[in-house]
């Protein structure tokens, strides 16, 4: 088995999918998991990007079905901007599409800035823009878990195969969640699910960005990665990609393994 095949298997990627079937499987997963845990529903941060829009709509469909079947579940969508979000219009469009039971907004700027100032005062140096970006992601995680803890809700994560293979998420930030309904999907497969669900094309054709950096607001994921999502998707779907692209992907996969594992102990061997 080639490394490419090993990665596809490890990340549960299917080269070809039926969007209708995948939607059904993922809604059922959300329903089954919330029933099994006894939780009261879900909470998810909505950025206006493809991934949170898709996960949010799947969550809302799941809680509606649970209620139609005589159960009780709710979904809270959370906006978590740092000051003014450049693409706020897209976030509002996503909320309109998702139709969450409840939507709330937390501006994380005061919390992030207070922490950054305290860090500088105590340690005598400023946080790098990169590390401050990770603080933003982790404050968003803390906010979602605070809501989840108060309301008895599970925190949904938006990680999918194209992020998992590169480790392109903040450990214990957007990587911190209770369940991941998009696991196994490539970026283009996620787009296909949104198309099937009737989303406005603006929500899945827009340039993906983590938007965590003050110095480079709205920087494209592909710029930071040095790899396009089409190349990632081709690789994950078992297609041929240029040798240098495959090497980049496989190197990122190897060095980011710690992000896909629980914290290491001396009894684990995945890191050796």
From Swiss-Prot:
Question: An example Gene Ontology cellular component term from the record?
Answer: cytoplasm
**Pfam family for this entry, one:** NAD_synthase
Q: What class of enzyme is it?
A: ligase
EC number(s) recorded for this UniProt protein: 6.3.1.5
Share an example GO biological-process annotation for this protein: NAD biosynthetic process
Q: Which SUPFAM superfamilies match?
A: Adenine nucleotide alpha hydrolases-like
Reply yes or no: does the keyword Electron transport apply. no
Q: Which GO MF terms are attached to this record?
A: ATP binding; glutaminase activity; metal ion binding; NAD+ synthase (glutamine-hydrolyzing) activity; NAD+ synthase activity
Give the residues the record marks as binding Mg(2+). 51, 163
Where along the chain is deamido-NAD(+) bound? 138, 171, 178, 258-259
The metabolic or biological pathway listed in the UniProt record of this protein is: Cofactor biosynthesis; NAD(+) biosynthesis; NAD(+) from deamido-NAD(+) (ammonia route): step 1/1
Provide the catalytic activity annotation. Answer: deamido-NAD(+) + NH4(+) + ATP = AMP + diphosphate + NAD(+) + H(+)
Q: How does it assemble?
A: Homodimer.
NCBIfam families linked to this entry: nadE, PRK00768.1
- What this protein is called in its record is NH(3)-dependent NAD(+) synthetase
